[in-house]
Amino acid sequence: MLLAFVRTDPDVPKHRGISALIIDTDTPGLECRPFPDLMGPDHLDFNEVFFDDVVVPRRNLVGDLNDGWRICTGALAHERAMLWVLWSEGLDTSIADLVRCVGDTPLAEDDVFLDRLGSLLIDAEALRLLGYRGLARLQRGLVAADQSLLKLMGSEGQRDVALLALDALGADALDQRKGTSVFQPWGANRGDASWFDRFLNSFAGTISGGTSEIQRNIIAERVLGLPRG
């Protein structure tokens, strides 16, 4: 099944003429072509989708006609907020994995490495507390912490841990045994990924659900109250 946001009224401005549809992938005229990404030819999490005179029954309409933008933004906000739990746990686990990999090597006493590691630990704690604050506010019926901030900190935090591992471990970052973790934020059977694999895969998190650039724009306008550029 696909959730598609389609233009249903071309005569209204901007976001008003979009509707949300559930589309069966077996529908005649619809073709999904999986394609590999940086993680390798067997990593097929993404597809390009083609529609050739596809007909979708009206019962597949989600919500009201031309109300798709509200549904889209609501779904994205929910996704960004709920993924906070995975981002937070994944960040803690990745940092612990890196500390284990460094062990008692000279890096464990390197000031530059320790400074970067300390910054990541602070960011991980800030992410956790920000998420808890948002949940507490929701329980009281108040506005939650901005979901875009949670998404931005979580996804970029995973990338930054992997980047530090690459800088610190050098060629060892290509060794799958150096990156093994019981926590698998990228999906089942990928817990043996090397730090290099983790680094490549981390970019998916900074793109899906709205890129980091989009999140920064949202934070600037809706949280900080800055004017639209």
Task: Indicate residue ranges for each PLM-predicted region.
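Structural beta-strand/beta-sheet cores of well-ordered domains, especially the beta-sheet scaffolds
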Residues: 2, 18-19, 28, 45-52, ...
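Short Ser/Thr-interspersed hydrophobic loop/turn segments at strand-loop and sheet-helix junctions
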Residues: 6, 22-28, 53-56, 76, ...
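Short Gly/Pro-enriched turn/cap motifs at secondary-structure boundaries
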Residues: 10-12, 38-45, 189-190, 209
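Glycine-rich beta->alpha junctions and the first turn(s) of the following alpha-helix
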Residues: 31-129, 205
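Glycine-rich phosphate/cofactor-binding loops in nucleotide/flavin-utilizing enzymes
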Residues: 69-80, 84, 169-229
